[in-house]
Amino acid sequence: MRKTLPSIGALGFSNTNAEKDLCCLGWYSNDPDTVVDAPEQAAEILWHLSGTADPDLALNTIIRLMEALGEQKGQLHNALRTDPELRVKLFSLLGASTALGDHLVAHPHTWPELQRPMPTRQEMFRLMLGSVGAARASFSSESQQPQGSDSDSEFSFGADLSADDTANTDLSTPGTYRAEITGERAEVALKTTYRSLLLRIAAADLAGTYPEDIHRTGLPEVPFVTVTKALADLADAALTAALAVAVAHVYPEGEVDTHLAVMAMGKCGAQELNYISDVDVIFVAEPVTPKAIRLAGEFIRIGCACFFEVDAALRPEGKHGVLVRTLDSHVAYYKRWAETWEFQALLKHRPMTGYMPLGQAYSEKLQPMVWEASQRESFVDNVQRMRRRVLENVPAKLKNLELKLGEGGLRDVEFAVQLLQLVHGRSDESLRTLSTIDALNALIEGGYVGREDGAELIRAYEFLRLLEHRLQLQKVKRTHTMPEATKTKQLRWLARAAGFKTSKLASATDEMNAMLKTSRLHISSLHRKLFYRPLLDSVVNISVGTLKLSPAAAKLQLAALGYVFPDRAMDHLHALAAGGSRKAKIQAMLLPTLMEWLSETAEPDAGLLNYRKLSDAAYDRTWFLRMLRDEGVVGQRLMRILGNSPYTADLIISAPDIVKQLGDGATRPKLLETSEDRVTKSIVAAAARHDDPDVAIAVARSLRRAELARIASADLLQMLSVQQVCRRLSYVWDAVLEAGLQAEIRASLIGSTGDKNSVPPARIAVIGMGRLGGSELGYGSDADVMFVCEPTEGVSDEAAVKWAIGVCDSMRSRLAKPSGDPPLDVDLGLRPEGRSGAVVRTLESYKQYYERWGEVWEIQALLRADFIAGDQELGARFLEMIEPLRYPEAGVSQKVIREVRRMKARVDNERLPRGADRNTHTKLGRGALTDVEWTVQLLTMMHAHEFQDLHNPSTLDSLDVIEKHAVIEPEKVEVLRQAWLTATRARNAIVLVRGKRVDQLPQQGTQLAAVAGAAGWEPSDSQQYLDHYLKVTRRARQVVDEVFWGVDSIEHDY
């Protein structure tokens, strides 16, 4: 006997009771003397059983089913021996679905239903309606009067209610029926019949992915579209029966006083339904009576109780809108108030049940509006925002497990296909299809998508839907989340249920995971395949299948992708990719991917133009296109920069070698591999090789330009914090001043002595002030400095100062010469006596001035003074000299504090430009930079004599010290810190976008979106970015009022 029957181990059972259960069924024996009836048939049964997704589950359910059948189990026994098709269907079903197995055990006499083919639409209607004894409903005379909800408006046309209802006496069609039974009895009948029909569909579907081999015969695979269409038909039939029960409940005696049509939306509307899915509906009625509203509500209640969630949230105004509207009311809403997403939702609508002529009228009136949606002014912004929302609400830990919402998931395909339908369906009626697969096929046939790309996407989409279906069937619950990698048993079950087999090379799970990874990759690249590749192919006239995107269609597509000037974008594409050169061919290969990345930036048009300029600038650099081709991260980062920051784009175009640094090094991004100290030394050393100051400054400018490009790129790519950006910008300025000062001294000595190594008349130190002194410069900051000199031995103070003034003035003039680079303005406004004071003073002169005449504002300015260039020893002595001035041993007097507050009041009242918005002025606005910095400086003046570590010029470092010593509450320190960082990042972002310093945040619109993008936000979230800025600075102003002014009010009298 053992020679005929396979062993338990070979069959793959793991349950300890498996052998006993198989013996009880008469299919197995571990006793050689025991004869199993028809052993060859028993072997076939055993092999078929072991091929299920979970043989133990299937066996356990069969035991329960046989027990439930009692004396009639022999019929099932005989059928399993003689009917291989039944074996495959039953075993596949029981091994894949606990819930449907339980249904079969609860209704054991329905097993012969599995011997029948998948139910037809007409059969499902007959069975569902027959289960509640339905018959055609009759309508009252009042229901024949259409109710024009906007009878006096341009939208009023009423509805023709003279057409017969589509309900049929043979119960095979949708329509308005009346059930014979209601209440719990009806609901039990509906549930049972629905599950039995679902069971037949699932059995046929699962049998199609049953693994066939030498031991097992399978059945032909049921096409995905056939399954989803059958599930949608079942939903139609089920809800038609639910409506019949609702009619009997709401109108128990009389005739129906309304014509109610139910419109299917979403996947049900598109006839691509899942096993378990919400069914979205919209109601239209003529007239809308109180009972019509009750009828719709009862319809939803019964559907939810018996089948699945019935959701009417896609109706006008969503859950806040009325449940039932007239046709006029629907039309009026969509003409006046509907948003873009609502027209996108209407892509999938169709009349489902109820009074079908009214449903058809609904479609005829609203469908044309769908195809005009792409002409709406807000279409592009809305579409891009909807696309970004796909991933937003998915928890990070689930993104790789999500079949629907994760990256490379089902929603990506559905969204992309719908967008192409909206863009091109206005002029091409062949694209006006409901289902995703039909739409993709239409796009392929219409030449909008290449045949190979389209077929690849269809395969990937259907595979993900297959996995989704198998996951849902297990417990007949809504889910689209893959099991975690650690749940090997669940993954093995899913792989087998989906038809994967273990081979010598890989397990079924490994095979499934590999195909899932490949499918996700195909889908994640779909925007290139569906949107950008056809554009490039139309430009370079590549023949891919039947691809024939016309210039007009290409421009439509570009506009939908966010390009404001599609004509210009097409010109750029022609310039880059047209022609037969090797470079053009590589560009044609790269651009679909690059353009997809550009579409996520604030200004795709500007980004594409910048890329064209950069390609021209790098034309002779053979590494450029090769690097973009071989290192994907370089291209992605480059597009983010080019599309978000004109300032950085210009810098990179003038220094293309920076692109080499956009890749990753061994341990970190290449942009971060060079230290600030090395940058400073290289700028100074390179300039020092040239005696001509113009050449030396030009060299320093060139290296500064490259370094600014590097810093700005790292900033835009979120590789640097605000504090790191400011520090690096400050060090670059320090290096340029050092290089410029040395160049002028060399030139002066060569001119006067002929020897650049001779002893100069004086030593010069450059003292950084303001944000330069605190190493907190922004992109648009000037260099606030003071010059101090000390005569060389034998040189008078007057001669030394005169010579130093000549050197410093010459350096300032040379640095300030107009050029294509960001400006190099050296500002002396914080020196003693301000702009009317001497350009250069000796150390003793500074000391005498500050001790005799220094005003409070001048002493306050010294809080941020630090040595940055020139003679280091002289600079250190200057700082030593001012130490007791800016940090008095006994602290500052109340008089000084009052004076500081008086000056701040003047700044608040007088310095803000006319017409400026105080709420969004990043420098002088409420809670912005000036507020925070003055508050920190006042606290420093008041407490520096107590805490030595407050003796530093940095605002952020001082805040850390203030928090460390609990000068004010930590919460308040954090509020001030975040306000300073937020305002500084905003100021930097404005320069990155505008190319110059602007203190005011732009108003809502493209400029604000660009600033938000440069500040690390999604451009589409510009309003949230603005709200965040206002919230942070508003909180900071409250702290400033309390800490700086010592009051709760922002009104000050000083």
UniProtKB/Swiss-Prot annotation:
The keyword Nucleotide-binding applies. Keywords: ATP-binding, Magnesium, Multifunctional enzyme, Nucleotide-binding, Nucleotidyltransferase, Transferase. Pfam families: GlnD_UR_UTase, GlnE. HAMAP family: GlnE. Its EC number is 2.7.7.89, 2.7.7.42. It catalyses: [glutamine synthetase]-O(4)-(5'-adenylyl)-L-tyrosine + phosphate = [glutamine synthetase]-L-tyrosine + ADP; [glutamine synthetase]-L-tyrosine + ATP = [glutamine synthetase]-O(4)-(5'-adenylyl)-L-tyrosine + diphosphate. It comes from the Bacteria. Involved in the regulation of glutamine synthetase GlnA, a key enzyme in the process to assimilate ammonia. When cellular nitrogen levels are high, the C-terminal adenylyl transferase (AT) inactivates GlnA by covalent transfer of an adenylyl group from ATP to specific tyrosine residue of GlnA, thus reducing its activity. Conversely, when nitrogen levels are low, the N-terminal adenylyl removase (AR) activates GlnA by removing the adenylyl group by phosphorolysis, increasing its activity. Residues 138-175 are annotated as: Disordered. Residues 138-150, 165-175 have a biased composition (Polar residues). Residues 541-1054 are annotated as: Adenylyl transferase. GO terms for biological process: regulation of glutamine family amino acid metabolic process. This is Bifunctional glutamine synthetase adenylyltransferase/adenylyl-removing enzyme. Gene3D superfamilies: Beta Polymerase, domain 2, Nucleotidyltransferases domain 2. Its cofactor is Mg(2+). One of its GO terms (cellular component) is cytosol. InterPro entries: GlnE, GlnE_rpt_dom, NT_sf, PII_UdlTrfase/GS_AdlTrfase. GO terms for molecular function: [glutamate-ammonia-ligase] adenylyltransferase activity; [glutamine synthetase]-adenylyl-L-tyrosine phosphorylase activity; ATP binding; magnesium ion binding. It comes from Corynebacterium diphtheriae (strain ATCC 700971 / NCTC 13129 / Biotype gravis). Residues 1-535 are annotated as: Adenylyl removase.
